Each structure stands twice: as C-alpha cells, then as structure tokens.
Curated annotation (Swiss-Prot):
Official protein name in the record: Vasoactive intestinal polypeptide receptor 1
Keyword list, A-Z: Cell membrane, Disulfide bond, G-protein coupled receptor, Glycoprotein, Membrane, Receptor, Signal, Transducer, Transmembrane, Transmembrane helix
GO CC annotations on file: plasma membrane; receptor complex
Family of this protein: Belongs to the G-protein coupled receptor 2 family.
Xref: Pfam families: 7tm_2, HRM
Organism: Mus musculus
Molecular function as annotated in GO: peptide hormone binding; pituitary adenylate cyclase-activating polypeptide receptor activity; vasoactive intestinal polypeptide receptor activity
Length: 459
C-alpha cells in the first residue's frame, strides 16, 4: 500500500512556490524564478534515477523502491524502518541539521511519513514562524533598496573619479592608472549586480525553466568575474605600494603590464575554468546557487589566496611605515609618528582588502539576515569609499581642481582664447610621473623617503 500523492507536476509547482515563500531567510534569491527551476530540475533528475533503478530491481518480499515526489525510498524488508535526511531541496536555503524523515515497511506497504509531512518533519514550520511574511517582505525590500542606493552612489562617484583622473594629464601616472583600473573593477561590479538582478528577478512571462536561459547564466558568469577582478585589483594596489616602498629601482612600465595581467587576466582564467566545469557537471538553473560546494572553490580559492597575500603585504607595509616614520627628517609638523601611521593605516585597510576577510570567512550557517546586510548593503558602498580615498581626498586632485577653478573664475565663461596655449592637462609644476622618475637621481634611501611622503600625502 502506497501513501496517496499529488500528481508530480502539481506537487513540484506547489512545493517550489511554498518553499520560496516559507524559507525567506535564504535571502532575496529565494524568490528567484531561476532558483525555482533549479529545484524542479533537481527533483526531476532524482525522480528519473529512482524510477530507472526501480525498474531494474527484481520482485522482493518487502517494500520495493518508491518515489514519493521528493525522496527515493530504497528497497526494504518487512518490519524495518528507513531513516533518511531531509531532501536536499530543504537544505539549499540554509543548512538544516538534525532533521530526519522515516518510513516503516509493513506487510501492507510503506507507512506514512514520520514524524509528519515534509514541512513539519524538516522544520519548515519553525523557520517560517520565526518571521512572518510581512516582516520578511519588508526586510528584503529594505535590503534591496539599501544595496541599490549603495551601488548607485558608488557607480556615480566612481564615474566622476574616473573622469577627473582621465581629463587632467598632470594626474596621469602609474599610481593613478592603477587606481583607475581599481575604479573600473568596482564600476563593473556595480553594473554586474544590476544586470544580474534584472536577469534573476525578471517578472516577465518568459519560460524560465526552459533551456533558453543562456543570458541569465552569462549574467551570473559576468558577475562572478567582476567580483574576482575586484579582489585582484585590490591585490595589485597592495603589490604596487609595497614595490614602491621596498624596491629602490624598478621599471614602472614593465610592472604595469604585469599588474594588468594579474588584475584582469588571472580572474578570466579561473572564471573560464569554473564555467567549463559547471557546463559539464552542474549545468542546470541559472548557476546562482551553491549545490556542489567543491565547484565553488574554483572561485573562492583564488579570492581567499589574494586576501591572504594582501594581509601579508599589509603587515610588511606597516613595518616599512613604522621604520620610515621614525626618522626626524621625514616630517616634524605632525603631532606624532603614530598619528601619521594611523592615517596611513586607515588608507591601507580598504586598499589591501583586509575588511573582506570578515565577509569571506562567514560560516555557511551564520544568520542569513545579518550576513545579507553585511555582504549586500555594506559591501555596496565600498566603491564610494574607494573613490573618496583615492580621488576626492587626493591632494594632487584637489590642487588641480582648485587651479582649474581659479582659471575658470578669472577668464569667465567666454575666456577660452588661451585654451590652445594651456590645454586640459597642461600645467606648471612637476607631474606625478615626473616625481617618480626624478627619484632615480637621488640615493635609494632618499627615493624611498620621497615615495613614502608622496603616498602619505594622499591621506
């Protein structure tokens, strides 16, 4: 005797909709139509495998293999109880430990599910009651509004910063070129978030469960590439500053192309590997969920390595700064070396991405709401902070803007006749690239001291 069951198609549709509403703590992605497709495709794959195995089995005196629309129950002799973990579909939203389901094989067939229906046996009632539907909706709307504002503000400020560093030729130097690539990585990351949201949460009438979801997969791949490139350009910032302070003589042009390869090339290699692996081993849905965690180490591993290297560089830079802040000839106007070290450290922490450590090492079972706020809302403002630190608070940028403002103020709106004599980037004084080249004419110790002063002046 088999327990009554709903028709498979109806069962699966009801389940997908119920889980998307009941398991809100999984994050805003729980409402994604593509994630519902992943659940349906996963269950369909398990169903086909179970039915194929059942057809190959011989008749037994016990209970034969059975598919109950969610779980495949193995062949079992009479009088035995089969205990299984809750289906993986319930664990996709958040790790659920300690919940099991069981059936007893009797002479009449399989018994009813114990300790009750799936939503009770797997603890969905407890999770759904922790936050009612209205509170969940308000929370997710607030999170989406928060990171939309953050990424929009970051995008606008980064575009302005890129324009400033591009238009003024006096600001063209290796250091600012690297800053511009870092800005671009944040711009692409913000753009990728908006594109991914459009692809994942499009409420149109498209058949999201069909194979015509290449655009959604491409959006997720682009998003993952932008995130990894963002980490690696933070690593490049650290490598450049460490080289500037620790190496007496080096070819900035040769090093710069190496930085380009690290910042944009290395992430593309790992993303291509990850894409190929997903196509062959996990090609269902929109690729925006973690089903096989081992595959995600192709992305997570290089990011964690870049964070580790940045942390090591951070310690080395702090050591160099302490040594360079002690000599009395570096600057006697500051109140104390420790105050300047504190200012430099505040600049280096976002530069080296140490703040990413807390995000990368959050445990999987950490409270989803708190993790979501940190990763989405707080992380969305990082581009804005970077633009403030490396452009708007840059002393050279401020001096150039003041000089241009004074020229515009004196000449007036129509006084551009002298523009041919004073082009956009033309200005008196030494450019930042000339400052670096002039360091080769002095001793290595004096060059390191001057380089250090140039970097600290950015604070």
């Amino acid at each position: 005797m088999r327990p009554p069951s709903l028709p498979p198609a109806r069962w699966l549709c009801v389940l997908a909709g119920a889980l998307a509403c009941a398991l809100g703590p999984a994050g805003s992605r729980a409402a994604s139509p593509h994630q519902e497709c992943e659940y349906l495709q996963m269950i369909e794959k398990q169903r086909q495998q179970c039915l194929e195995e059942a057809q190959l089995e011989n008749e037994t005196t016990g209970c034969s293999k059975m598919w109950d629309n969610l779980t495949c129950w193995p062949t079992t002799p009479w009088g035995q109880v089969v205990v299984l973990d809750c289906p993986l579909i319930f664990q996709l939203f958040s790790p659920i430990h300690g919940y099991n389901i069981s059936r007893n094989c009797t002479e009449e067939g399989w018994s009813q599910l114990e300790p009750g229906p799936y939503h009770i046996a797997c603890g969905l009632n407890d999770r759904a009651s922790s936050m009612d539907e209205q509170q969940q909706t308000e929370f997710y709307d607030a999170v989406k509004t928060g990171y939309t504002i953050g990424y929009s503000l970051s995008l606008a400020s980064l575009l302005v910063a890129m324009a400033i560093l591009s238009l003024f030729r006096k600001l063209h130097c290796t250091r600012n070129y690297i800053h511009m690539h870092l800005f671009m990585s944040f711009i692409l990351r913000a753009t990728a978030v908006f594109i991914k949201d459009m692809a994942l949460f499009n409420n149109g009438e498209t058949d999201h469960c069909s194979e015509a979801s290449v655009s959604c997969k491409a959006a997720v791949v682009f998003f993952q590439y932008c995130v990894m490139a963002n980490f690696f350009w933070l690593l490049v910032e650290g490598l450049y500053l460490h080289t500037l302070l620790a190496v007496s003589f080096f070819s900035e042009r040769k090093y710069f192309w190496g930085y380009i390869l690290i910042g944009w090339g290395v992430p593309s290699v790992f993303i291509m590997i990850w894409t190929i692996v997903r196509i062959h081993f996990e090609d269902f849905g929109c690729w925006d969920t973690i089903i096989n965690s081992s595959l995600w180490w192709i992305i997570k591993g290089p990011i964690l390595i870049s964070i580790l290297v940045n942390f090591i560089l951070f310690i080395c830079i702090i050591r160099i700064l302490v040594q360079k802040l002690r000599p009395p000839d570096i600057g006697k106007n500051d109140s104390s070396p420790y105050s300047r070290l504190a200012k430099s450290t505040l600049l280096l922490i976002p530069l080296f991405g140490v703040h990413y450590v807390m995000f990368a090492f959050f445990p999987d079972n950490f409270k989803a709401q708190v993790k979501m706020v940190f990763e989405l809302v707080v992380g969305s403002f990082q581009g804005f902070v970077v633009a403030i630190l490396y452009c708007f608070l840059n002393g050279e940028v401020q001096a150039e803007l003041r000089r241009k403002w004074r020229r515009w103020h004196l000449q007036g709106v129509l006084g551009w006749s002298s523009k041919s004599q004073h082009p956009w980037g033309g200005s008196n004084g030494v450019s930042c690239s000339t400052q670096v080249s002039m360091l080769t004419r002095v001793s290595p110790s004096a060059r390191r001291s001057s380089s250090f002063q140039a970097e600290v002046s950015l604070v």
